[in-house]
UniProtKB/Swiss-Prot annotation:
CDD domains: TFP_snake_toxin (cd00206). Expressed by the venom gland. Keywords: Acetylcholine receptor inhibiting toxin, Disulfide bond, Ion channel impairing toxin, Neurotoxin, Postsynaptic neurotoxin, Secreted, Signal, Toxin. GO terms for cellular component: extracellular region. It is found in: Secreted. It comes from Pseudechis australis. This is Long neurotoxin homolog Pa ID. SUPFAM superfamilies: Snake toxin-like (SSF57302). Belongs to the three-finger toxin family. Long-chain subfamily. Type II alpha-neurotoxin sub-subfamily. Disulfide bonds join 24-42, 35-63, 48-52, 67-78, 79-84. Negative results: does not show binding activity to the acetylcholine receptor of an electric ray eel nor lethal effect on mice.
Length: 89
């Protein structure tokens, strides 16, 4: 009886969708954020402003549901694994 109960518990756990959540870097300090269930991508957005020559490109990082389309002056990089969006070099 105990074996049957244990088997049922193991099968139940294996069949459940345990709700994997993605984590993405959210800033230059490499802190991570847990993405909402509908956000299945990590994204890094870079662009230049008037101080780009002195300070380097501006940067936004985090979770997203879709990878934005490329636009003039903006660069997007998207990926699908935990913390796969490091600060560009």
């Amino acid at each position: 009886m105990k074996t049957l109960l244990l088997t049922l518990v193991v099968v139940t756990i294996m069949c459940l969708d345990l709700g994997y959540t993605l984590t993405c870097y959210k800033g230059r300090d490499r802190s991570s954020e847990t993405c909402r269930s509908e956000q299945e991508l990590c994204c890094t957005k870079t662009w230049c402003d008037q101080w780009c020559q002195d300070r380097g490109p501006r940067l936004e990082m985090g979770c997203t549901a879709t990878c934005p389309r490329r636009m003039p002056g903006l660069d997007f990089t998207c990926c699908t694994t935990d913390n796969c969006n490091p600060v560009p070099t």
